[in-house]
Design a protein with these regions (language model features):
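Haloarchaeal acidic low-complexity proteome signature biased toward cell-envelope/secretome components but also
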Residues: 1-16, 78-93, 100, 111, ...
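Gly/His-enriched, cation/cofactor- and phosphate-binding structural elements
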Residues: 5, 12-17, 22, 47, ...
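Anionic-ligand anchoring segments at beta-strand to alpha-helix junctions in alpha/beta enzyme folds, i.e.
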Residues: 14-77
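Short glycine-rich anion-binding loops that position phosphate/pyrophosphate groups of nucleotides
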Residues: 24-25, 94-97, 116-118
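Divalent metal-coordination and catalytic microenvironments
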Residues: 26, 36, 65, 114, ...
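His/Asp/Glu-rich metal-coordinating catalytic cores
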Residues: 57-85, 89, 93-104
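Short alpha-helices
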Residues: 113-180
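Glycine-rich, Lys/Arg-enriched anion-binding loops that position phosphate/diphosphate groups
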Residues: 166-237, 244-251
Length: 347
């Protein structure tokens, strides 16, 4: 049987489905959860819920949830533990309990559908395809093969997710993404796609991106910078996307202090660099980090710096020094910045 048929039969024997999104879910994760929920409904599961943790702070992600009216509930540990027989737990766009999610390590997972690199997947149903550009591509394949009702909301969600995850089919896109988009295109709401593609940007996000630009240092073709302390988590990937287009830059890494953690976002077009592996090597011993060859992220608890100082300015200086040093070591770079660096970042 195909993966779609195997999944459908597995779902048809269950009575309840809990879908857990990864922390701070993006459109690929959200659209995949929406599609899996529709498949579960078609398979006869009446009790379904989608849980998330972290923030949906990116303007595009907020618009995605609001305009498509996606029903989400805050993560509840009780929902994934001590489950009744016939109750299934599913991960979409992530794969391992405790890795980029709040599910306790060791929790049994029934379904995993993902395209991110991972070597520790353990579930009854696993469809793990690193070669595809988006998890939504896999779910679109299921929807198509199983003849699930493709209404405007689902088609728009899946198509936008694929476009966003592949940066308009320019990053990691395969033939599968184009095939999926061709199938979804006639069913999607074009006006809604335009609204999702051009959300408003907050002043705080612009300020954070401006700080990243000001603090940049460049070594070879690698740019490293920080946004200081911010509440705008999604300013980091937006800054990384923008700074990766700077002339002479192939890799851009942006970090910042958010609440009690250091968040890291990276983008790379350098064929010699697997930025996900580089971040994992640099931070796996103190936090969680990893991702694809071209895009990756990470999180390091601020608590490991708590013994140094309680002053935010001093703390930022220490964080900048330590995080930058680990990045330089992970990428085999020297500590001497080039002339492209911002003057204020090297004074």
């Amino acid at each position: 049987m195909s993966p779609a048929q195997t999944l459908y039969e597995f779902l048809s024997e269950a009575s309840e489905l809990t879908i857990v999104c990864h922390n701070n879910p993006d459109p690929d994760c959200l659209a995949s959860a929406l599609a899996l929920g529709r498949i579960a409904a078609a398979a006869g599961i009446d009790t379904r819920q989608v849980l998330y943790s972290g923030d949906i702070s990116h303007q595009q992600n907020r618009a995605f949830v609001n305009l498509l009216d996606i029903d989400l509930e805050p993560f509840d540990p009780a929902a994934v533990q001590n489950r009744d027989e016939g109750s299934l737990l599913a991960f979409v766009d992530h794969a391992v309990p405790g890795a980029n999610n709040r599910v306790p390590e060791g929790t049994p997972v029934d379904i995993v559908i993902d395209h991110h690199p991972s070597e520790e997947i353990d579930a009854q149903f696993v469809d793990h395809r690193e070669a595809v550009g988006a998890t939504a591509t896999i779910l679109t394949e299921y929807v198509r093969e199983l003849a699930i009702d493709l209404d405007t909301t689902l088609a728009t969600a899946l198509l936008f997710a694929i476009r966003r995850e592949t940066l308009g089919f320019l990053r990691g896109a395969t033939r599968a993404e184009y095939d999926a988009a061709g199938y979804l295109h006639d069913h999607a709401d074009r006006d809604l796609l335009r609204q999702l593609s051009s959300p408003s940007v907050s002043g705080a996000t612009v300020d954070a991106i401006a700080t990243a630009i000001q603090n940049r240092t460049v070594r070879g073709s690698v740019l490293i910078t920080h946004v200081g302390r911010t509440n705008e988590r999604d300013a980091l990937p937006q800054a990384a996307d923008y700074l990766a287009t700077l002339e002479g830059v192939d890799t851009a890494i942006v970090f910042g202090m958010l609440a009690e953690a250091i968040q890291i976002s990276a983008r790379s077009t350098d064929a010699r660099v697997h930025i996900g592996d580089a971040l994992h090597e640099a931070f796996a011993d103190v936090g969680s980090a990893g991702g694809h060859r071209e895009m990756a992220g990470g999180e390091v608890p601020l608590g490991i710096f708590a013994d140094y100082t309680s002053d935010d300015t001093q703390l930022l200086a220490i964080v900048d020094q330590v995080i930058t040093a680990r990045l330089l070591a992970g990428l085999n770079l020297t500590d001497e910045p080039d002339d492209q660096s911002s003057p204020s970042a090297t004074e």
